[in-house]
Regions:
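Short, acidic, metal-binding catalytic loop of nucleotide-sugar glycosyltransferases
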Residues: 1-11
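Glycine-rich, basic loop-to-helix element that forms the pyrophosphate-binding segment
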Residues: 28-31, 39-55
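A conserved acidic beta->alpha catalytic loop
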Residues: 18-26, 67
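A recurrent flexible, glycine/aromatic-enriched loop bordering the glycosyltransferase active site
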Residues: 88-97, 109-126
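Short aromatic/hydrophobic "clamp" motif used to bind/position activated sugar donors
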Residues: 60
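Conserved donor NDP-sugar-binding/catalytic core segment of glycosyltransferases
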Residues: 72-100
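Acidic helix N-cap motif at the loop->helix transition within catalytic regions
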Residues: 23-32, 72
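A short, conserved alpha-helix in the catalytic core of glycosyltransferases
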Residues: 130-135, 140-161
């Protein structure tokens, strides 16, 4: 991510939420320059919110620990961030080594994501002002919390005359 953002003269801050990890996530993240926040309750919404509320930038990218984005994704994201009309977005999901029937399910999700502008939880970006206006992800949900967040983000986008983008090919 650094190259795409630094090329534009932007500062990059990495905030990692340690949500009771047992694999030294916090120590590894700190050793690599990230700021680590801790969330005691094991819930993805709370972990995302802890990191999101700690972030100091104008934009927030939520990236799941098991996601492996390419540099092109960050470049495409940065291009969208430069546009005043962009409120947020995400990317279609790609997974390797899946059986055909699972690939069909993923294809269906990606279609729904593109049509309804619903970024998958594995990679969501949005303006920090929108995240704070929404008060983050709902603590009431233990699954599909990103869909509920996306729906509220879309409402703000419509109200502001902005857009949610789903990147197809980074």
């Amino acid at each position: 991510a650094g190259a795409a953002f630094r090329a534009r003269g932007w500062e990059l801050e990495v905030v990692v939420c340690d949500n009771n990890s047992t694999d030294r996530t916090g120590a590894i993240a700190e050793a690599n320059g990230a700021r680590v926040v801790f969330e005691a309750e094991n819930q993805i919404s709370r972990a995302r919110n802890a990191a999101g509320h700690a972030a100091r930038g104008d934009w927030i990218i939520f990236l799941d620990a098991d996601s492996t984005p390419c540099e092109g994704l960050f470049a495409a994201t940065a291009e969208l961030m430069e546009m005043d009309s962009t409120l947020g977005g995400g990317v279609v999901i790609r997974m390797e080594c899946m059986p055909w029937w699972a690939q069909m399910g993923l294809w269906k999700w990606n279609m729904i994501s593109r049509v309804f502008k619903l970024p998958a939880g594995s990679y969501i970006f949005c303006r920090a002002t929108a995240f704070r206006e929404l008060e983050g992800f709902s603590h009431k949900l233990f699954a599909a919390e990103e869909i509920e967040f996306d729906l509220r983000l879309n409402r703000i986008a419509r109200r502001r005359g902005q857009q949610i983008h789903i990147i197809r090919r980074p």
